[in-house]
């Protein structure tokens, strides 16, 4: 990477946060060109601690990564804006209600969103799902259902049990997805397991896997897309048609 040109860091994910921290600690390793981080908010939540936040073990500020402060420490500009797409042919990042941003080099760390599979609140983006849980009444007699019995769904529903010891909780799985030991654990926690696609009109939280951010063309026209809406990358985490202009996480 030469000193000339503009490097854009698209998204405030964990990888970009760690890179900023490294540049702040070792400024001699920071590239010499103009660098800007673009993210929809000035803070990011560390997702690994979210079940603990839901359970009441942590306060929200303990999970918050201050991206603006990291940028200041690393000598990087920060722009608070929502990324809506990417035009790799013209080397432009598309933003909501803002002019597009030109780049010479681009690094993507935009995260993922929950895969839609039913009516409910997706666990990702985290800000919306956490606001939903804050709005819920722990004494409500209507069961809250977590849809998806993978690792995330299990963590979330068990965290909810600690948060709400008396609230009726359900976990919806594909038939036969959970092994007997997990079934027993959920039974002991008084969490009802629902098989299949049983309809549910009450409040629900989607933990149904993740997919890419759902960008529309020209991204899909100029960049190869992998499954679940993710951008295809080479073994070096680069985008083959755009290398070396972009790297991707």
Residue ranges and their predicted role:
Residues 2-3, 7, 73-143, 207:
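FAD-binding core/adjacent interface of flavoenzyme oxidoreductases
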Residues 2-76, 155-181:
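Beta1-alpha1 glycine-rich phosphate/pyrophosphate-binding loop at the start
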Residues 10-12, 108, 147-148:
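Conserved N-terminal Rossmann-fold NAD(P)-binding element of oxidoreductases
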Residues 35, 107, 203-205:
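Hydrophobic beta-strand scaffold positions of dinucleotide-using enzymes
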Residues 79-82, 87, 173, 193-197:
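Short loop/edge segments at beta-strand edges and connector loops
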Residues 121-140, 199-249:
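FAD-site-proximal beta/loop scaffold in flavoenzymes
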Residues 131-167:
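Rossmann-like NAD(P)H-binding beta-loop-alpha module
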Residues 168, 180-217:
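Internal nucleotide-binding/catalytic subdomain
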């Amino acid at each position: 990477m030469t000193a000339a040109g503009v490097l854009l860091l698209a998204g405030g994910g964990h990888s970009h946060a760690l890179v900023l921290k490294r540049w702040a600690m070792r400024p001699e390793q920071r590239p010499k060109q103009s660098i800007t981080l673009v993210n929809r908010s000035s803070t990011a939540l560390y997702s690994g601690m979210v079940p603990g936040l839901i359970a009441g073990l942590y306060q929200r500020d303990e999970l918050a990564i201050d991206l603006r402060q990291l940028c200041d420490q690393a000598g990087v500009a920060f722009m608070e804006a929502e990324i809506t797409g990417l035009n790799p042919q013209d080397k432009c990042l598309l933003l909501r209600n803002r002019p597009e941003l030109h780049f010479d080099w681009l690094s993507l760390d935009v995260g993922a969103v929950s895969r839609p599979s039913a009516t409910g609140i997706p666990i990702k983006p985290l800000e919306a799902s956490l606001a939903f849980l804050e709005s819920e009444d722990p004494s409500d007699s209507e069961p809250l259902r977590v849809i998806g019995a993978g690792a995330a769904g299990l963590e979330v529903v068990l965290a909810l049990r600690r948060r709400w010891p008396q609230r009726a909780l359900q976990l919806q799985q594909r038939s036969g997805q959970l092994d007997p030991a997990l079934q027993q654990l959920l039974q002991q926690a008084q969490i009802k397991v629902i098989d299949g696609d049983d309809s549910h009109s009450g409040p629900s939280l989607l933990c149904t896997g993740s997919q890419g951010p759902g960008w529309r063309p020209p991204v899909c026209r100029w960049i190869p897309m992998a499954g679940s809406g993710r951008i295809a990358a080479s073994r070096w985490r680069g985008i083959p048609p755009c290398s070396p202009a972009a790297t991707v996480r």
